[in-house]
From Swiss-Prot:
This is Putative NrdI-like protein. One of its GO terms (biological process) is protein modification process. Belongs to the NrdI family. InterPro entries: Flavoprotein-like_sf (IPR029039), RNR_NrdI (IPR004465).
Length: 156
């Protein structure tokens, strides 16, 4: 049994919706897996300590920024910084396959900017992106990437 871990934070419910639908899709399409959702907001809210991951994971990161335009005059990450703290904890960065970014395309250059910044900061790739809650095609696309990373076998 392979454990697929999805580390994320959801503030407006969009990322939670995507990760939940992704989990359901993965379980319906691939055999011999279990999917673990690790919601960083819950760890923080419950006062639990961060811990080292003992197996690989994929991170999901929405974009919450203030100030600047993300290109010419900077920006400041807000609300999602606990994900960065979790990834930076112990050897967690080395266990991260990569990050899936989300956001709103109306923000132009700031769309998925936090995911791009984490990619540079921690040295792992941006695996994919989706807008708002994501569409079924986004779920299928990210599931295919995860299947390749974890070397999963299709159910049928």
């Amino acid at each position: 049994m392979k454990t697929i871990s999805l580390v994320y934070i959801s503030l407006s419910g969009n990322t939670e919706s995507f990760v939940t639908r992704l989990k359901d899709y993965l379980l319906s399409q691939y055999k011999g897996i279990e999917v673990q959702k690790i919601h960083i907001k819950d760890l923080v809210k419950e006062g639990k300590n961060f811990y080292e991951m003992d197996h690989p994971y994929v991170a999901f990161l929405p974009t919450y920024l203030e100030g600047g335009n993300g290109v010419d005059n900077g920006d400041v990450e807000i609300l999602t910084t606990p994900v960065g703290d979790f990834i930076a904890y112990g050897n967690n960065a080395s266990k991260c396959f990569g990050v899936v970014g989300s956001g709103n395309r109306n923000f132009n250059n700031q769309y998925c900017l936090t995911a791009k910044q984490y990619s540079q900061r921690f040295g792992f790739p941006v695996l994919a992106d989706f807008e708002m809650r994501g569409m079924l095609e986004d779920i299928k696309h990210v599931a295919a990437i995860i299947a390749d990373l974890y070397e999963l076998e299709k159910e049928n």
